[in-house]
């Protein structure tokens, strides 16, 4: 596949699938690079660092854990521009959050995080009952059963992926993270490479 596609460069981000692809590309003398998002690199990037032409890091400390063929470059973490350029005022208008109301955004990454979902369940029920704050929570793609639990507690099913009650919205996945992040007064999330 690599030979047929003939890429100009191959870039990996540490997933186990990137290992064999980058190893084969390196054998074919195709320029290869990896990007490590974490302070402590995973196994795949540790192995590839010795073979690739360029290693890019989010944080400088990661270099201590890598045996790089060439000097690594600290690039930081590439972030979509819309995450940085949205105004709080326009984001809150887009989400219909009134001025003076507090907005909490909570999520456990794209797949979700069961401990966070479990912890947030009672908090979200309380916020929905008292209407004191606006709250958007994502259960993640692996947390769809939580939507049914909220419906059992009186939430309205807006769609297959969204339930709502009063000032609380629970989503399977947040497609407009740029808007939600810009509008939020408080973000509760698990530690992840890009969150």
Please report, for each region that a protein language model flagged, where it lies by residue.
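Donor-nucleotide binding loops and adjacent catalytic segments primarily
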Residues: 88-90, 97-189
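Helix N-cap/beta->alpha junction signal
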Residues: 14, 58-60, 192
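Hydrophobic acceptor-binding patch used for acceptor engagement in glycosyltransferases
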Residues: 10, 186-187, 194
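Active-site-proximal region of nucleotide-activated glycan assembly enzymes
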Residues: 26-89
């Amino acid at each position: 596949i690599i030979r047929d596609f003939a890429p100009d460069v191959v870039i990996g981000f540490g997933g186990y699938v990137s290992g064999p692809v980058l190893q084969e590309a390196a054998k074919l003398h195709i320029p290869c690079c990896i990007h490590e998002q974490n302070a402590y690199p995973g196994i795949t990037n540790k192995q590839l660092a010795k073979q690739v032409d360029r290693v890019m890091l989010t944080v400088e400390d990661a270099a201590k854990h890598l045996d790089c063929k060439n000097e690594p470059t600290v690039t930081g973490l590439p972030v979509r521009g819309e995450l940085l350029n949205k105004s709080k005022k326009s984001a809150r208008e887009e989400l219909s959050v009134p001025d003076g109301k507090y907005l909490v955004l909570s999520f456990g990454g794209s797949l979700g995080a069961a401990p966070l979902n479990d912890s947030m369940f009672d908090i979200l029920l309380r916020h929905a009952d008292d209407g004191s704050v606006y709250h958007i929570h994502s259960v993640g793609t692996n947390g769809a059963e939580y939507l049914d639990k909220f419906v059992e507690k009186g939430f309205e099913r807006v769609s297959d992926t969204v339930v709502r009650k009063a000032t609380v919205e629970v989503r399977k996945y947040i497609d407009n993270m740029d808007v939600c992040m810009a509008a939020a007064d408080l973000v509760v999330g698990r530690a992840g490479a890009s969150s």
